[in-house]
Amino acid sequence: MGSNDPEPVNLCVWWKQFKDPTLDTLVEKAFANNFDLLQAFERIRQVRAYYNIQTANLFPSLDFNGTFSRYATSQNLFDSPFLGPRIQNLFQLGFDVNWEIDLFGRLRNLKAAAQADLIATKDDYISLMVTVLADVARNYTLYRAFEKKGENLKRQIQVKKTINDLNRSLAKSGLESWDLFYLTRAQIRALEAKVPPLQMQMEYAVNRLAVLTGEQPEFFTIKGEGDILKARGLIPLNIPSKLLQRRPDIRKKERELAAATHRTAAAVADFFPTFSLSGSYGWEASRFFKWFRPESSSWDITPGLALPLINFGRIQSQVQIKAAEQKEVFYAYQAVVLKALEEVENNLFTYMQQQGRIATLELEYKDFLENQALALSRFTSGLSPLVEALNQEWNYLNVEYEWIEANQVLSESLIALYKSLGGEWECFGTL
């Protein structure tokens, strides 16, 4: 690795490379309190429980039951001494066993499909987490950029007002025409018109950060001072060679495809017979004290067979449905892969172009700064009026505004790039 190469970025905590403690705190709050993430975590618990059900279906079920009944027979219907006393008791206690023998893999495929659904749900959670954390970083970037733009506009307005006062004085004394005065005043109003939209955008960014971190917007504030995020020279390595391993939405589609494949196999298994085995063992007696005697025991074993014969194409249609769903998921998987590659290429291209733009703006800013220093030197020497120095100051403030905006776009493109890479899903541990 050359000396000018960027350091490898840990995609687990990519936002820490900005070295902004306020951003780190906001990310931690979002990770712990975001309601969309909390909902997604509960969906994992639901799907895990369903997977446990499908796993349990592979094994026999054992039930315990016990009953007591007392009944009287009708003398009109059963008037016979061979039936025993008219009023009788029946004590029953025992165990029932039921088991579907999965010879053709129906239950095994349903279990495998449920397992794939569980993994897909976990990847969906990670995908949402990546989106939420990227939204936090993006809105924080917007907030800091709007903050710096507002400060720059105040300075521009202040300089323009000073220039306007000088133009008024010169026009009143007849040394200049009123054209410059009205032009400068129009420029001041144009600058002042930019302030309300900027304040609205700042408020929107703050409110969005409040929602992302699980707080009420009216009580949410960003504490501490900060600068616009520095994103120059920060680029992750291995792009896009490991993209397919990192993006949770691609992994999710892979698991959904696996689940659809197993459900198709389970539907095909319905063409074949279903074997079952049931049995029971227990004790039955008419007297309580005879309940657990050896002669009171009873048992039965019942093998079962069910084979579909005539269903007018229901099973075949069900197989066709599952096969079509499987192909649909396959096409969705291919679309997600292409979209992921497109996002990475677009964000990477934007990032590289913005770096070039910022480098040019910095050279322009440096030239205007030197020009302003020369104009100020000429003014102090009595070689040029103050308005010339002020105009040069406004020029470099205007370039500074563009530089802030370019850095904002650069940070947004870098955040979008990390989002499109999907992070390191292994960092999130076992869900």
State each model region's role.
Residues 1-50, 147, 175, 228-258, ...:
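Bacterial Sec-pathway N-terminal export signals of envelope proteins
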Residues 107, 116, 123-239, 350, ...:
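Periplasmic alpha-helical coiled-coil/stalk elements that build and connect Gram-negative outer-membrane
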Residues 219, 230-231, 402-431:
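Acidic, low-complexity, intrinsically disordered peripheral segments
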Residues 1-19, 28, 66-96, 219-236, ...:
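Small/polar, glycine/serine/threonine/aspartate-rich low-complexity segments that form flexible
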Residues 38-39, 55, 101-129, 179, ...:
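Sec/SRP-type N-terminal targeting helices
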Residues 171-178, 379-383, 420-424:
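A short glycine-centered flexible hinge/capping loop motif at secondary-structure junctions
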Residues 23-25, 46, 90-92, 138, ...:
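Transmembrane beta-barrel architecture of outer-membrane proteins
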